Amino acid sequence: MQYTEVMVRYGELSTKGKNRKDFIGRLAGNVTRALQDFPEIEIHPKHDRMHIVLNGAPFDKIDQRLKLVFGIQTYSPTIKVEKNLDAIKKASLELMQATFKDGMTFKVNTRRSDHEFEYDTNQLNTMIGDYLFDNMDNLKVKMKKPDLVLRIEVRQDAIYISNQLLHGAGGMPVGTAGRAVMMLSGGIDSPVASYLAMKRGVEIDMVHFFSPPYTTEKALAKAKELTGILANYSGKINFIAVPFTEIQEQIKEKLPEGYLMTIQRRFMLQLADRIRAKRGGLAIFNGESVGQVASQTLESMVAINDVTSTPVLRPVATMDKTEIIKLAEQIGTFDLSIEPFEDCCTIFAPPRPKTKPKLDEARKLENRLDAEKMIQRAIDGMKITPIYPNQKFLDDKAQEDADLL
C-alpha cells in the first residue's frame, strides 16, 4: 500500500498552553532527526497535528522510527485525495482491501472542518459505506468498537483518508524538560530509568564509572552499547566515562567494610553533580529502587544524598524488579543488561554492607580521605563520547565470551 503521508497527533502537548509552539517545534526537530535517512520526506508541524509527506518513502520503514519518538500520542498512515466523491471512493476501497481480514467489523467516520463541502458527514458515511459493501465481501458494520474505523477528514485543502490508528511512544518531546545527567551502570535498572526520564522530555548525558583494571574494556563497551540502544528514543547521547579506580582503592584500604558501599555512592553522587554543573544540567537521575539492595534503603539514600542539594530523581523507585525487567525487555535493553561483565558497583561489594548507615558516621569516615583531590583527578580523567542510535561497541567475540560465562 502506497500512502501519501502520515498524520501525527500530539500527546500531552495539548495541555501546554503558551509553550505549545515551542513543544511542537522541538517535536518536529526530533522527528526530523529520527527520519534523517529519508531525504524525500517533508515535515509540516501544525497547531493540532503534524503532517509527514512521504513522497514515495516506504511507510513500513518510517513506522519503525516514528514509534520511538516521544511526544507522539497516535499516528495514521494516510491517503490524501482531491475533494471529489470518486477519489474518496477509490482511496477508501484501496485502504480497506489492504487491511481488511475476514471476520473484521468496521464503520465509516467522517469529520469536516470545511463545511462548504457538498456532502455532510452523514451523507459521506452512507455513500462510502454503501460503496464498500458493493465492492467487498464479508463486510460487517459495528458502530461501537469496530475492528477498523475508516476515517475521512474533509479539510480546506484536501480530503485525508485512513483506517489505522497506531500508538506512539507518548510522553513529551526529548529536550522540552531540560538537561540532566543519568548515572548509568551496566545493569537492568538504570537503562529503564533512562528511558523513563527521556519519556518525560529530559535530555540526558550518561555518566558511567569504570575502574580498570578491575573492570574490563568489555564492561565499558557494554555500557556504551546500552546507550546506543537508548539513543533510538532520543538521537545522539553523550556518554561520559569517569575513572573511579583510585577512589575505590582508597575507600577499601582505609574505611570499614560495612560503609564501603555508602561512601562509594557518596563519591559517585558528588562526581555526577560536578559533571551536571559543568554541562548545564538541572538534575541527577539514577536507577535506584527503594529497598532493592543495601544502598537503596531510605536510610542509605539519606546518607548518600547528603552530598548534594541537586534534585536526585529515581524513575523506577517504586517498581518491582519484575516490572523493571518487563519494561527493559520492551525497550530492548534487557538481553544486553544481563551480559555478565562486572561493573564498578559489584567488584568491591562487601559481603555485609550497612543497610541503615548513620549520616554522621558516613561524613566522619569520608573526612578521612582526601576527597576533593580525588574527585578533581577523576573529573580531569573523564572522557566524553557521542553515541548514536544502535551504535555497536561489543564485537562478536565479546558476546560469545559472555554467553559462556
From Swiss-Prot:
GO cellular component assignments: cytosol
Class of the enzyme per the UniProt entry, highest EC level: transferase
Localisation: Cytoplasm
Pathway named in the protein's UniProt entry: Cofactor biosynthesis; thiamine diphosphate biosynthesis
Keywords (A to Z) from UniProt: ATP-binding, Cytoplasm, Nucleotide-binding, RNA-binding, Thiamine biosynthesis, Transferase, tRNA-binding
Positions of ATP binding: M183, L184, H208, F209, R265, G287, Q296
GO BP term, example: tRNA 4-thiouridine biosynthesis
EC number(s) on file: 2.8.1.4
Reaction catalysed by this enzyme: [ThiI sulfur-carrier protein]-S-sulfanyl-L-cysteine + a uridine in tRNA + 2 reduced [2Fe-2S]-[ferredoxin] + ATP + H(+) = [ThiI sulfur-carrier protein]-L-cysteine + a 4-thiouridine in tRNA + 2 oxidized [2Fe-2S]-[ferredoxin] + AMP + diphosphate; [ThiS sulfur-carrier protein]-C-terminal Gly-Gly-AMP + S-sulfanyl-L-cysteinyl-[cysteine desulfurase] + AH2 = [ThiS sulfur-carrier protein]-C-terminal-Gly-aminoethanethioate + L-cysteinyl-[cysteine desulfurase] + A + AMP + 2 H(+)
Residues annotated as domain THUMP: 60-165
GO molecular function list: ATP binding; CCA tRNA nucleotidyltransferase activity; tRNA binding; tRNA-uracil-4 sulfurtransferase activity
Function description: Catalyzes the ATP-dependent transfer of a sulfur to tRNA to produce 4-thiouridine in position 8 of tRNAs, which functions as a near-UV photosensor. Also catalyzes the transfer of sulfur to the sulfur carrier protein ThiS, forming ThiS-thiocarboxylate. This is a step in the synthesis of thiazole, in the thiamine biosynthesis pathway. The sulfur is donated as persulfide by IscS.
Record's protein name: Probable tRNA sulfurtransferase
